[in-house]
């Protein structure tokens, strides 16, 4: 099923990815999207949301650094994207960390139909209402089953769920996949998950099956990180960051197929 031709479609079509993202990761997200052949726009003024929704091929909403004006812009953009039939991705950064973040995410989920939600296990557990000890915006620890969390959120909100970790878990509520790739250096650079959300969005912009797009995006991204680590003389995050950008710029269907470790199942048992 996963032939990774979605990767080629991103190069061919150069989708316009509208990011309403946080101030920590905006530059890296934009550069990462450019590296894979997508076209980023980082507009966040509420006055331009309707126009941007008509232009963009996908909208990615990231709650990393919130304020009231930005939340208003997110809601306007999300509703406009729904009307336009544009895919919308939510990255609920640190949703379990504060009551304000939980409130904002619940409002966004109530007002916008998201094509996909991507976060770490702690963030998705918070959305699912499962017990989890979050550590700020990091995943933290918990005893809930990650597959069950993915299934619950996917079915409750009619969306694809992507839970990032040592093994990524992807589900649309009926289909499940695990991606067992990735460099250990990825979580040591800030914004690697935020960029993955944007990359998933770019794949959804050119592939109607959001589940397939998500699996192929996660695998391609993780494999690129492995190739980046191979090139390093010193396995350190400062060296890894630019090397990873280069790996994204030089990724290919053949490279990804050669290393991708995907386990797919039709149901969660």
Curated annotation (Swiss-Prot):
Task: Give GO BP annotations, semicolon-separated.
Answer: thiamine biosynthetic process; thiamine diphosphate biosynthetic process
* GO MF term (any one): hydroxyethylthiazole kinase activity
Asked whether the UniProt record includes Transferase among its keywords, one would answer yes
State the pathway, as annotated in the record: Cofactor biosynthesis; thiamine diphosphate biosynthesis; 4-methyl-5-(2-phosphoethyl)-thiazole from 5-(2-hydroxyethyl)-4-methylthiazole: step 1/1
**InterPro entries, alphabetized:** Hyethyz_kinase (IPR000417), Ribokinase-like (IPR029056)
**Catalysed reaction(s)?**
5-(2-hydroxyethyl)-4-methylthiazole + ATP = 4-methyl-5-(2-phosphooxyethyl)-thiazole + ADP + H(+)
Identify which cofactors the protein needs according to its UniProt entry.
Mg(2+)
Q: What is its EC number?
A: 2.7.1.50
What is the annotated role of this protein in its UniProt record?
Catalyzes the phosphorylation of the hydroxyl group of 4-methyl-5-beta-hydroxyethylthiazole (THZ).
The entry sums up its family as follows: Belongs to the Thz kinase family.
What name does this protein carry?
Answer: Hydroxyethylthiazole kinase
Which species does the entry assign this protein to? Listeria monocytogenes serotype 4b (strain F2365)
């Amino acid at each position: 099923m996963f032939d990774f031709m979605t990767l080629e479609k991103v190069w061919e079509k150069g989708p316009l990815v509208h990011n309403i993202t946080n101030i920590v990761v905006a530059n890296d997200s934009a550069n990462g999207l450019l590296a894979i052949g997508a076209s980023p726009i980082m507009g966040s003024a509420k006055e331009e949301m309707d126009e941007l929704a008509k232009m963009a091929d996908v909208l990615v909403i990231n709650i990393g650094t919130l304020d009231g004006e930005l939340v208003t812009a997110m809601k306007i953009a999300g509703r406009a994207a729904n009307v336009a039939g544009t895919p919308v991705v939510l990255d609920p950064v640190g949703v379990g960390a504060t009551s304000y973040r939980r409130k904002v995410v619940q409002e966004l989920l109530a007002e916008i139909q998201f094509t996909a939600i991507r976060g770490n296990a702690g963030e998705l557990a918070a959305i699912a209402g499962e017990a989890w000890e979050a550590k700020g915006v990091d995943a933290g620890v918990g005893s809930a089953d990650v597959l069950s969390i993915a299934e619950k959120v996917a079915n409750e909100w009619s969306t694809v769920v992507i839970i990032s970790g040592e093994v990524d878990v992807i589900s649309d509520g009926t289909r499940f996949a695990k991606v067992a790739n990735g460099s250990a250096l990825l979580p040591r650079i800030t914004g690697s998950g935020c960029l993955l959300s944007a990359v998933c969005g770019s794949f959804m912009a050119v592939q109607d099956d959001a589940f397939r797009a998500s699996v192929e995006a996660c695998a391609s991204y993780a494999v690129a990180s492995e190739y980046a680590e191979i090139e390093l003389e010193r396995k350190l995050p400062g060296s890894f960051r630019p090397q990873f950008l280069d790996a994204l710029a030089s990724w290919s269907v053949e490279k990804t197929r050669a290393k991708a470790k995907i386990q797919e199942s039709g149901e969660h048992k």
